[in-house]
A protein has these predicted regions:
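Active-site-proximal structural scaffolding
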Residues: 1, 10, 27-30, 34, ...
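Active-site neighborhood of glycoside hydrolase catalytic domains
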Residues: 1-61
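Alpha-helical packing segments of well-folded alpha/beta enzyme cores
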Residues: 1-8, 142, 166, 246-258
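Hydrophobic alpha-helix feature that most strongly marks membrane-spanning transmembrane helices
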Residues: 6, 10-13, 42, 147, ...
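Short amphipathic alpha-helical segments
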Residues: 30-31, 63, 300-303
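Conserved alpha/beta catalytic core and glycan-binding cleft of carbohydrate-active enzymes
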Residues: 34, 38-218
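Carbohydrate-interacting/catalytic domains
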Residues: 154-156, 160, 169-335
Length: 335
């Protein structure tokens, strides 16, 4: 494994490695494999990015080796996704059951481990650890990815009405954003779970294991869940290139504006749960991200009072009393 990682960087000149499910690697050695891997590839080229997926909410992943960590450059942050998706869609099945409060997303904007040593109801135990010693840039956040879409029974992407606000929340966060293929133009094709196992025993185990893992989701109860081994499942998942030109333009605008925002920790966060639903205000220097997750419009006075809408997902305005008006499921960057 170590030589393979070195080869990808040295011989094939990749600019980074993404390590899958490192929480499933059991290693009690004095010099952990994951630490040595990062050391070896960084020795070849300093600017190589080692990005880990860990289901443990453990800041040790990105801590330097000198501090007892693995020295990876970044780590995925699933809790940010869960906190965001549950507000956008109202889903509460399975591991989403312990999310859904606007306070969860407010906490995630500080550091995206919502479970940071707190009790996890889906796991039945305390989970995670605080990560305030790690800079925000080390956390990779997303509104969709291959796991969160592909692990759904039918591979359905985020509902279209939720996509603009999801993009706003993710791309204007202080963290490192990741886009899922076709997300930026509202790709119409699903991304279903597909496989091509030659061994029938493994194929059967894949089907059964998938249903078992997601048994708490009602959509997995029916017999119509696509068969991972059926070639049609793979064909349905191919990108079409069709989508929403307006959404693509919004993504471009968000990425442009992101470059102007101050780097580092956010300055202030205020969560609201009135006026018909949850809202969140996140201040970054002179800018405030105002997000309305409610099913109806809101008008709220923010502090400090803004006088300009820099960018918004939908129509937004500053009213006479200085309040920011937003329609349902919308976001505005004001200053």
């Amino acid at each position: 494994m170590l030589q393979s990682a070195e080869g990808w960087i040295r011989d094939f000149h990749l600019d980074g490695l993404r390590l899958d499910a490192i929480h499933a690697i059991y290693d009690s050695s004095a010099r952990p494999l994951l630490r040595e891997l990062a050391e070896r590839v960084h020795a070849i080229r300093d600017q190589v990015h080692v990005i880990a997926e860990s289901g443990l909410n453990d800041p040790k992943v990105t801590r330097p080796a000198a501090q007892g960590g693995y020295g990876h450059d970044a780590a995925w942050a699933d809790d940010f996704h869960h906190a965001l998706r549950t507000l956008l869609t109202g889903e509460r099945e399975g591991y989403y059951a312990e999310f859904g409060r606007v306070g969860d997303l407010a906490k995630a904007y500080r550091r995206p481990f919502v479970n940071d040593g707190t009790y996890s109801t889906s796991r039945g135990r305390r989970f995670g650890a605080p990560a305030f010693d790690r800079p925000v840039e080390e956390f990779v956040v997303f509104a969709q990815n291959h796991d969160q879409v592909g692990n759904r029974a039918f591979g359905d992407r985020l509902p279209a009405p939720a996509r603009p606000l999801a993009a706003f929340c993710t791309l204007l966060s202080p963290f490192t954003p990741m886009l899922f293929m076709g997300e930026e133009h509202g790709e119409e094709a699903p991304f279903q779970f597909f496989s091509d196992h030659i061994d029938e025993k493994i194929a059967v185990a894949t089907r059964e294991g998938r249903r078992r893992e997601f048994a708490s989701f009602a959509s997995f109860a029916g017999e119509e869940v696509p068969d991972p081994q059926d070639p049609v499942t793979f064909e349905h998942s191919k990108l079409t290139g069709r989508g929403d030109a307006g959404l693509r333009e919004l993504y471009a605008d968000l990425l442009r504006v992101r470059r102007t925002l101050p780097r580092g920790d956010v300055d202030d966060i205020v969560a609201f749960d009135d006026m018909g639903g949850p809202q969140l205000a996140v201040r970054r220097g002179p800018y405030t991200l105002f997000m309305n997750f409610a099913d109806g419009p809101v008008s709220r006075v923010l502090a400090p009072r803004p006088n300009e809408v820099v960018l918004s997902t939908h129509e937004a305005r500053i009213e006479g009393d200085g309040a920011v008006w937003l329609p349902a499921q919308a976001g505005a960057l004001v200053r």
